[in-house]
């Protein structure tokens, strides 16, 4: 089988820390990616006027790999795939890898939302039967392939998606006046400031937005470039698990400030962001779900896979679920 784990794999069973143990307020992080906090804090009139800026393609239901069992078990739920895109190497969305993958499931009756973060290096099966890292599906077949991959491997009933280019973080954070982040020392003891500043240079190059470099660790106020660089950091220990925690931390702070932002600020953000958002939600659907936002509450959250082994495969270092059925 293409992508079969080697005997050099390293087993890992991770304690339920981070995402799984966060408070309800901290779990609001993923709302930014899912229903887009901007949509639910702005007025309906503003959103409706700007909706034409949003792109997206319809999904073919026959190609989404939704099983009969998943269709039945998914009755009464809205399950949405959330993609944060890495489009640095391409001008087109097709070919971009999904740097962040989340699944949000809304119980339509109780209004409870459950969130799952799928680690980008997780080995999963694509529609052609080949195995590859989870973040490769978007590059190979766009939203349709990525959604089908999640449905096929995790027995889900996903028909909707939201995709956001990570570059929009820079503009959103700057429009909100920056965010406060505690930049901690690396788990493995290395000096991460040079690595952070390498990412700062990269973000400046890709967005054209200037920024000062990092000069220290600890609690500090970050601008859009700095916060995006922090969210992308892959060094310092903790592998992709620690990186996804940093991304959630940044998104949490954005959500907190966006909820308190003035309408003029939200309008400014929408002008910057909507051009970089893709979804197959219609305006009518979005407004219908947004009107109940105050009733939404967060339930169980976790990362996938919970139990895993790491292995060096044909597709590179990968995270392999040791018990896909239980995960």
Stretch-by-stretch model annotation:
Residues 3-111, 288:
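Entry/capping segment at the start of metal-dependent catalytic domains
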Residues 174-265:
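Flexible, polar/acidic helix-loop-strand segments at domain edges
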Residues 100, 131, 143-151, 166-170, ...:
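Extracytoplasmic/secreted envelope proteins and their assembly/folding machinery
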Residues 83, 89, 109, 121, ...:
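Structured segments of extracytoplasmic/periplasmic soluble domains
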């Amino acid at each position: 089988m293409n992508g079969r784990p080697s005997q050099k794999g390293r087993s890992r069973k991770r304690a339920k820390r981070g995402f799984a143990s966060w408070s309800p307020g901290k779990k609001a992080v993923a709302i930014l990616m899912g229903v887009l906090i901007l949509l639910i804090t702005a007025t309906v009139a503003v959103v409706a006027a700007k909706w034409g800026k949003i792109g997206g393609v319809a999904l073919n239901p026959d190609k989404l790999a939704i099983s009969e069992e998943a269709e039945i078990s998914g009755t009464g739920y809205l399950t949405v795939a959330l993609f944060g895109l890495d489009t640095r190497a391409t001008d087109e969305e097709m070919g971009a890898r999904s740097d962040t993958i989340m699944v949000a499931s809304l119980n339509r009756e109780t209004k409870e939302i459950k969130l799952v973060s799928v680690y980008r290096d997780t080995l999963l099966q694509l529609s052609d039967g080949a195995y590859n890292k989870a973040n490769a599906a978007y590059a190979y077949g766009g939203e349709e392939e990525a959604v089908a991959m999640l449905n096929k491997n995790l027995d889900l009933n996903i028909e909707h998606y939201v995709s956001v280019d990570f570059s929009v973080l820079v503009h959103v954070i700057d429009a909100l006046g920056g965010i406060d982040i505690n930049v901690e020392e690396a788990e493995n003891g290395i000096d991460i400031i040079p690595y952070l500043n390498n990412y700062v240079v990269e973000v400046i190059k890709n967005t054209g937005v200037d920024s000062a470099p990092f000069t220290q660790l600890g609690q500090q106020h970050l601008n859009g470039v700095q916060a995006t660089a922090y969210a992308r950091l892959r060094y310092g220990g903790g592998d992709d698990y620690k990186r996804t925690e940093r991304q959630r931390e940044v998104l949490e702070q954005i959500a907190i400030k966006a909820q308190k932002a003035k309408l003029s600020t939200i309008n400014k953000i929408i002008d910057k962001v909507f051009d970089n958002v893709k979804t197959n939600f219609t305006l009518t659907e979005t407004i219908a779900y947004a009107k109940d936002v105050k009733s939404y509450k967060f339930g169980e959250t976790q990362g996938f896979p919970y139990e895993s082994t790491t292995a060096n495969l044909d597709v590179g270092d990968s995270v392999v679920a040791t018990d896909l059925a239980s995960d």
